[in-house]
Curated annotation (Swiss-Prot):
The gene is rpoC2. It is an enzyme of class 2 (transferase). One of its GO terms (molecular function) is zinc ion binding. Zn(2+) binds at residues 224, 295, 302, 305. It holds the Pfam family RNA_pol_Rpb1_4. This is DNA-directed RNA polymerase subunit beta''.
């Protein structure tokens, strides 16, 4: 007894809680020490003990045991507070929807996680024996996350698509859920239930496919004799120790391992836990192990390459079906991957980035040159550091150094005061190369209806040149300017023109009479005019019949509805993505329109011209034809425009053919009549017959000219041409043959006609050979066009009005629109323009400045009493000078809006500048902006005039009284010429900048004299009474605001509201017309401006703002719709593309594995293995040349892709806590990667190109033939691999049975019944386990015959040849390999183990 006591005392007393994992470890240790039988006895005792204790405990569970965590209240409140701030930022347009979604998810995820951690400590302190607590951490059933849902908060749910719902469930199941929360949680739960069902079936199918790929892999030898291995290093910190141990245990060493001179392990020794520990303690060299990858054969595996059997811990037995075990070990946990979907479903894993916190209070300092300002993924401003950044924090003489790793975000500014534990930097979550990321698109929809507006340049995506998909080049705002369109009950026509003002009453009147069609015309007019439009009633009311347009005081134009659509002053045709605007000026008060001269100005939709682009074109009526025909230039030189300097950028509009620049003085047009008939039409004339005028061709068409008929049948239609002209029968066929299809100039004699006469005109000779009749020649008349060189600016525009100044340059170029000999088809009655005269815009610059490549054009319409004028402004302003100094220099800080967003439209001059600085800036700007304004207006009725102004005749006003501008006053002011005073009319966004409301306006008075005065506050008021002034809005349309009426623009009911300023001298916020103002930006002394919008009118004491909503869009987002398009509520505005990491996403477990095994690349950016494989292939072949390149390239590629595939699959399983031994995955990956694809070149006599063959087989064939096979590696998915095996019976029993069997029959394939499945299908004994020996003997008998033949022939080449062709036959080396001594047999075996 005493002895027993002393033994007890020597034992280790283990006072620890044993949970599931500890239990697993204990059992494995027990098996190692005592073996199976003894362990089972011990475990029986443990079981009995457990049941006794559980009976004594008698745990019960009541609702009172669910204790809510006390800190939950303030945690939730805090999260709500953060969400509220976020919502505000989103509303102001500082953060866009994706950033908002990300951040709100992370806020709630963090709250939920914190609560979960609190839960455990809370229970431990308040009630350690709480049954809920005991159960949840017992490891038996249920886990912390479920208890968390009972007593913490349910947290975030995913919707059925796996996307997060950003409304968290704040209650837990103990408190009960509200109705909304209940519905959201049903979403999640339903998803869970459905998932479980669906994914169980998925996992089952995955298992089936996996087993299909590897069912034939059986352990058939002890050693394949390979010398290769995969190296694993314990010193490399990449692999955690746990994974390192898992990788090594049960493997076999491929090489001896030395520790200094001493050998601590030898080749072919299997690795146990003792050996692994020794490796770790000794920090040994890299360890080379044998894996299924290194085994020499593809269709079986040897004991040493497989290693220990997982069941009993010894080397695997011969005849073990390791393939099927591997398939099932990967497929079966698939069901577990699915069962864990819905506890924390779909949380962004990127959510928990590491933070760097300040060690103490103090001022932070770092080198600003090493950081780069950027936006974090939440939309916060931050600095990105590219290299290790050392940050110092000074506090009371103590200096702390903090090191921030590269690619981190720094969240504080230089010299900022930070508090202790404040987050100063965020380290990006480790970016693995194999981090699964997917691209997600998020559409943002409009909340209100209105007009679309961009605040920066947006460019077309190149692939959608003509579509409405635009990409954003930088972060900017999109604005929806509010306003609803009027919808009418019947055909909408409006009496008002664009930008007219009208009172609300008149709008309703218009609606009333339009919806009541029985009202007569007279009543309409009467009612319309008597309804007191703007308080004054004047003008004769003519009868409706005689009026074409009613002339009414100043602002109202009444247009007869019938002609409304034809003569609106700017008839803009949309052609793909340009506006083509024919100019017709309408002189009010005249009945007839001016004849349009045909000059059309063409402006790209985004308003940007590049150099040498076409500004306007003029279709000369002399070059119009009404009939179809062919153009010929004869032999005269004409070349397509490709020369660099002649290159005109012209996006081919659909109906324009490629242009040919004319170096031609004349060209010819050969008319012909063409009828295009449907293929089914019955034609009443024969081919090659001659008909007269007005002959019936088909039932309802008649010919317009007489001549020869040619009928051509195209695919679905018939082309019938009638050539007019004389027919000549030449005497000698060979002589005339050179005249076929040529032009003959006048003055040539006709030789073959009886009387010789000179030709008056050009003719075209065309030979025609009918089938039976005599050969004849058709002589056709030709229309000759001379191209006048005289067309230049002077002929288009009168010389006295044409002034080219400074740097702008217009050039006239003629283009023939059709190529030489190209047939031209006129459609029904339209006329065909043969030559187009284009105005090409170009500009020069001083050599010093950087060249401006593009210019902005915009249109304005100015309307004064009785006359409408259109301006086209083109300016070369590159960009406004924005002046920002270093951040710590307070004297020159740029303007930053209060809420931290960056405004693109606010002029960067701000009151912090000293005055001299501004004047200096203004002078600089004057030198820089070389602007040009062209005015098109009709001075007299006959011609259009074009005035070219340039920066020399425009001058800029500064807002200061001490700056004197003399040049403006001296300038002679022409009557009738409104010159805009500023030339910084930008792209359509910023029209005219008005500083402080009074520095200058664009003033046009009634008597057409341009008045320019600079008003200070005092004398502005008296001039205000006498002047009617006009303002430009953001579209460059000038109109007259009337401050006393209630303003409504048709067709928008705009939400205007007035904002009164109490102006003082100090108020110097710069408000410019067309500027966008965000919410809560302070523009006046009396508090913040409350709504966001666009400034439409700036008046002495108030500003009119059209309310607008900003949407932030970041770089690379896609904008839908065009600038100025009217959007309705719910239309798509923007599409964001953002990356979301998928790796740890629990919902993504099984599909991810399947995606990797099937080698699909669904939306996965960082991991597209197939592309990598191709890349590796190409590089290596390029470096090493052909034969070696293919051999080594394939080897390396396969090795690379195998390792990465194994890592990817393991990563998914480990993230779920499922442990699978690498060797199972390796067996399957080996099958996916063991095939190569034969290329086109070389080896055509053995393999056909595109054939899939095993890599080993390709190498051996190459060695036997001593010539290179060109092949490249290919990754097959498991389904394709199952359909590309050596056994057609196995393939047919998997998928596509009929196809596989038919092919096998045609090719005469032989199935050697190697695998398990073939034998099962045919009812034979399967070649594993006990059936394995039988197979060996059978294969011996099989192979006797060829062996005997081979010993007679000593020709090695023939023998190798035959081995390759009969490569299916294999010998299996069981333990009886000692019998084989004969060399020929040995060589045969060596070749036959594929």
């Amino acid at each position: 007894m005493g002895v027993l006591m002393t033994e007890r005392a020597n034992l280790v007393f283990h006072n620890k809680v044993i949970d599931g994992t500890a239990m697993k470890r204990l059992i494995s240790r027990l098996i190692d020490h005592f073996g199976m039988a003894y362990t089972s006895h011990i475990l029986d005792q443990v079981k009995t003990l457990g049941f006794q204790q559980a009976t004594a405990t008698s745990i019960s569970l009541g609702i009172d045991d669910l204790l809510t965590i006390p800190s939950k209240g303030w945690l939730v409140q805090d999260a709500e507070q953060q969400s509220l701030i976020l919502e505000k930022h989103h509303h102001y347009g500082n953060v866009h929807a994706v950033e908002k979604l990300r951040q709100s998810i992370e806020i709630w995820y963090a709250t939920s996680e914190y609560l979960r951690q609190e839960m455990n400590t809370n229970f431990r302190m308040t009630d350690p024996f709480n049954p809920v607590h005991i159960m949840s951490f017992s490891g038996a059933r249920g886990n912390a996350s479920q208890v968390h849902q009972l007593v913490g908060m349910r947290g975030l749910m995913s919707d059925p698509q796996g996307q997060m719902i950003d409304l968290p469930i704040q209650s837990n199941l103990r408190e009960g859920l509200s109705l909304t929360e209940y519905i959201i949680s049903c979403y999640g739960a339903r998803k869970g239930v459905v998932d479980t069902a669906v994914r169980t079936s998925d996992a089952g199918y995955l298992t089936r496919r996996l087993v299909e790929v590897v069912q034939h892999i059986v352990v058939r030898r002890t050693d394949c004799g390979t010398i290769r291995g995969i190296s694993v290093s314990p010193r490399n910190g990449m692999i955690p120790e746990r994974i390192f141990i898992q990788t090594l245990i049960g493997r076999v060493l491929a090489d001896d391992i030395y520790m200094g001179p001493r050998c601590i392990a030898i080749r072919n020794q299997d690795i146990g836990i003792g050996l692994v520990n020794r490796f770790i303690t000794f920090q040994a060299q890299t360890i080379s192990i044998r894996t299924p990858f290194t085994c020499k054969s593809t269709s079986w595996i040897c004991r040493l390459c497989y290693g220990r059997s997982p069941t009993h811990g010894d080397l695997v037995e011969l005849g073990e079906a390791v393939g099927i075990i591997a398939g099932q070990s990967i497929g079966e946990p698939g069901t577990q991957l699915t069962l864990r979907t819905f506890h924390t479903g779909g949380v962004f894993t990127g959510g928990t980035a590491e933070h760097v916190r300040a060690p103490s209070n103090g001022k932070i300092k770092f080198n600003e040159d090493w950081v780069h300002p950027t936006r974090t993924r939440h939309g916060h401003p931050a600095f990105l550091c590219y290299i290790d950044l050392y940050v110092t924090i000074e506090s009371e003489g103590i200096i702390h150094n903090v090191n921030i790793p590269p690619k981190s975000f720094l969240l504080v500014q230089n010299d900022q005061y930070v508090e202790s534990e404040q987050v100063i930097a965020e380290i990006r979550a480790g970016t693995y190369t194999f981090n699964f990321k997917e691209r997600v698109r998020k559409h943002i929809y409009s909340d209100s209806e209105g007009e679309m507006h961009w605040s920066t340049d947006v460019y077309h995506a190149p692939e959608f040149t003509y579509g409405n998909v635009h990409l954003l080049p930088k972060t900017s705002h999109l604005w929806i300017l509010s306003g609803g369109s009027c919808r009418f009950s019947i055909v909408p026509f409006s009496i008002h023109k664009d930008q007219d003002q009208m009172s609300v009453r008149s709008l309703s009147v218009e609606r009333r009479y339009i919806s009541n069609p029985s009202v007569t015309n007279d009543q309409v007019i009467h009612e319309f005019f008597s309804s007191d439009l703007s308080g004054k009633k004047e003008g004769r009311i003519p009868a409706y019949s005689e009026l074409n347009r009613i002339i009414y005081t100043g602002r109202y134009n009444l247009i007869d509805p019938a002609i409304l659509h034809e003569n609106s002053d700017l008839l803009a045709k949309r052609r793909r993505n340009r506006f083509i605007i024919p100019f017709q000026s309408i002189q009010e008060g005249e009945k007839e329109l001016m004849p349009p001269s045909g000059i059309s100005i063409e402006i790209p939709i985004n308003g940007i011209f590049r150099r040498n682009s076409i500004l306007a074109y003029f279709d000369d009526p002399r070059y119009r034809r009404n009939s179809s025909g062919i153009t010929k230039y004869g032999t005269i030189e004409a070349h397509s425009i490709v020369k660099k300097e002649d290159l005109i950028e012209y996006r081919g509009v659909k109906e324009f053919k490629p242009k040919y620049q004319m170096k031609v003085d004349r060209f010819f047009f050969i008319p012909e009549e063409v009828h295009i008939l449907p293929g089914s039409a019955s034609i009443m004339v024969r081919n090659n017959s001659i008909i007269g005028v007005d002959t019936r061709i088909t039932l309802n068409t008649r010919s317009r000219v007489s001549g020869l008929v040619r009928v051509e049948r195209k695919k679905k239609r018939i082309e019938l041409k009638i050539f007019s002209g004389d027919i000549q029968f030449p005497g000698e066929t060979n002589k005339i043959s050179r005249h076929i299809g040529i032009l003959i100039p006048p003055g040539t004699r006709k030789k073959n006609s009886k009387e010789s006469k000179k030709l008056k005109n050009w003719i075209y000779v065309q030979g025609i050979t009918p089938t039976k009749k005599k050969y004849f020649v058709l002589v056709r008349p030709v229309v000759t066009y001379e191209i006048a060189d005289g067309i230049n600016l002077a002929t288009l525009f009168p010389q006295d009005l044409l002034q080219e100044r400074d740097n702008m340059h217009l050039q006239v170029v003629n283009y023939i629109l059709y190529g030489n000999g190209k047939p031209i088809r006129g459609i029904s009655d339209t006329s065909i323009q043969l030559v187009r005269t284009c105005l090409v815009l170009n500009w020069y610059q001083e050599k010093k400045s950087s060249p401006i490549e593009k210019t902005h054009a915009s249109f304005m319409e100015v309307r004064t009493n009785g006359l409408i004028r259109d301006f086209l402004t083109i300016n070369l302003v590159k960009s406004y000078i924005s002046y920002t100094g270093k951040r710590n220099d307070p004297s020159s800080s740029g303007l930053i809006a209060d809420n931290g967003s960056d405004h693109t439209n606010i002029n960067p001059f701000y009151s912090i500048y000293p005055k001299e600085r501004i004047q200096q800036l203004l002078r600089q700007r004057q030198k820089k902006n070389q602007g040009t304004i062209r005015t098109l207006l009709n001075r007299n009725k006959e011609c259009q005039s074009l005035i070219i102004l340039s920066s020399s005749n425009c001058s800029r006003m500064g807002p200061f009284n001490d700056v004197k501008y003399h040049n403006v006053i001296k300038e002679s002011i022409k009557k009738d010429t409104p010159i805009p005073i500023r030339n910084s009319l930008g792209p359509l966004g910023t029209a005219l900048q008005i500083t402080n409301f009074y520095s200058f306006y664009h003033l046009i008075t009634h008597n057409h004299i341009l008045v320019t005065k600079y008003f200070q506050l005092d004398n502005f008021k008296q001039t205000f009474q006498t002047l009617k002034y006009y303002l430009m809005d953001e579209n460059g349309i000038t109109y007259n605001p009337d401050p006393c009426s209630n303003i409504i623009l048709n067709p928008f009911n705009l939400n205007w509201y007035f904002l009164h300023h109490n102006y003082c001298e100090e108020t110097s916020t710069i408000i410019s017309l067309g500027q966008f103002i965000c919410e809560n930006v302070c523009i006046a002394k009396n508090g913040p401006h409350l709504k966001s919008g666009q400034v439409l009118i700036v008046q002495v004491d108030s500003v009119v703002i059209r309310s607008a909503k900003p949407y932030l869009a970041t770089l690379g987002a896609t904008v839908h719709g065009h600038y100025g398009e009217i959007l309705y509520e719910g239309d798509t505005l923007v599409t964001f593309i953002y990356e979301k990491s998928r790796s740890g996403d629990i919902t993504q477990g099984l599909p991810k594995v399947e995606q990797v095994l099937e080698v699909r690349s669904i939306d996965s950016i960082s991991m597209n293995l197939e592309k990598r494989v191709e890349g590796w292939n190409e590089h290596i072949t390029r470096i090493l040349g052909i034969p070696w390149g293919f051999f080594i390239g394939a080897e390396l590629t396969i090795a690379q892709s195998r390792i990465s595939l194994v890592n990817k699959i393991q990563k998914v399983y480990r993230s779920q806590g499922v442990q699978i031994h690498n060797r199972h995955i390796e067996i399957i990956v080996r099958q996916i990667t063991s095939k190569v694809l034969v290329s086109e070149d070389g080896m055509s006599n053995v393999f056909s190109p595109g054939e899939l063959i095993g890599l080993l087989r390709a190498e051996r064939t190459g060695r036997a033939f001593e010539e290179a096979i060109c092949y490249r590696t290919i990754l097959l998915g498991i389904t394709r691999a199952s359909l590309n095996t050596q056994s057609f019976i196995s393939e047919a029993s998997f998928q596509e049975t009929a196809r596989v069997l038919a092919k096998a029959a045609l090719w005469g394939r032989i199935d050697w019944l190697k695998g398990l499945k073939e034998n099962v299908v045919l009812g034979g004994m399967i070649p594993v386990g006990t059936g394995f020996k039988g197979l060996v003997h059978r294969s011996r008998q099989h192979n006797n015959i060829p062996l005997e033949m081979e010993t007679k022939k000593n020709n090695l080449f023939e023998r190798e040849m035959r081995d390759i062709l009969f490569h299916h036959r294999e010998l299996f080396d069981s333990c009886s390999s000692k019998n084989f001594h004969d060399t020929s047999e040995q060589s045969f075996m060596g070749f036959n183990d594929s």
